[in-house]
Amino acid sequence: MENGETKVGRECEVIIKSYGIANPQWTRKLNDSPGWMRLGFSIYKSLKDFPFVCEVFPSASYKMLEKENLVYELCVNNFTGGVKDMLDASVAAVTVFEFINGRGCKVGGEDGLGTIVLPRKIFL
């Protein structure tokens, strides 16, 4: 994507935007990132030795699953501190479950900046 004269956006974000699945906030470089994004970068880096790590874009998952009547159990203990964050975390877990069970896909990766897992397949 272009922002003024600068091209921004990881390939995975551009794909999600181009399919109209969600409207991602373009990922910044580490040095240009706010604190919460730096924390995310450090968590991702600390997980480098895990067999696989999935990045999920919850807004894309909500859009792809909105008419599927997908049901899952959710415990609401400790929700008062961040309802939206807890819902996003739960749909992220469902998204990875759907992906691992062959119903989803991952997009991006050709630019070396990671992939995003989606709960349903799209055809590029």
Identify the role of each PLM range.
Residues 1-124:
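Phosphate- and other anionic-substrate recognition elements at nucleic-acid/protein interfaces
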